Amino acid sequence: MKIWKIGVVGCGNIAETVYIPQMEKIKNARIVAVCDSNGMRAKQIAEKFGIEEYYDDIDEFLARSEAEICMSISSIIGRHEVNMKILDAGKHLYSQKPFAPDVEAATRQIELAKRRHVVLSTAPVHRNRPEIRLAKKLIGEGMIGHPSLIKMDVTHGGPEYYQYRDTDPS
C-alpha cells in the first residue's frame, strides 16, 4: 500500500485541532512536514505531533520537503497565493475553504492544476450535510419545482467559538 507524504501549510487552530489529528488516523498517509509563516508556531506543531520537518518559508518548504500532497490551511487572505505556489511546484493540493477569493482566481488555480497534472480539491463546505443532500435529492426529483433562490443559515448551537480558543488563532 502506498503511503502518501503530506505537507501541511498553515499551523493555526484548525490545523492543530482538526486536520492534523484526523490525518494521523489515515493509514496510507503520513505528515512529513509543516509550514507556517510563524516559525515558532510551525516548530510547536511539529514537536507536538512528532513531525520531522518544519518551515517558515513556503518556497523552502516546497523545494525541500518530500510532500506529495499539500494541505493548504493558511490564512484566507494569503491562501490563493499559497495554493498557486503549491500547484506550480507540481504538488497535489487539498485546500481549506475558500480556496480562492473570486471566480477568476479559482479559474487560475484550476487551469494551473491541469497544466501541472495534479489534483486540486477543496473542503466540501456544506455539500455533505444531510439536509443539503436531501434538498439536492428533492430538487433533482422535481419535488419542489425549480428554485430561484436558496437562503440558508447555519449555526453550531453553542457559545461564540473564538472567544474560548486556547490556541494561536493565526
Residue ranges and their predicted role:
Residues 1-49:
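N-terminal Rossmann-like dinucleotide-binding module
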Residues 34, 70, 150:
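Receiver (REC) domain switch-region micro-motif
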Residues 108-125, 145-149:
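Rossmann-fold dehydrogenase core element
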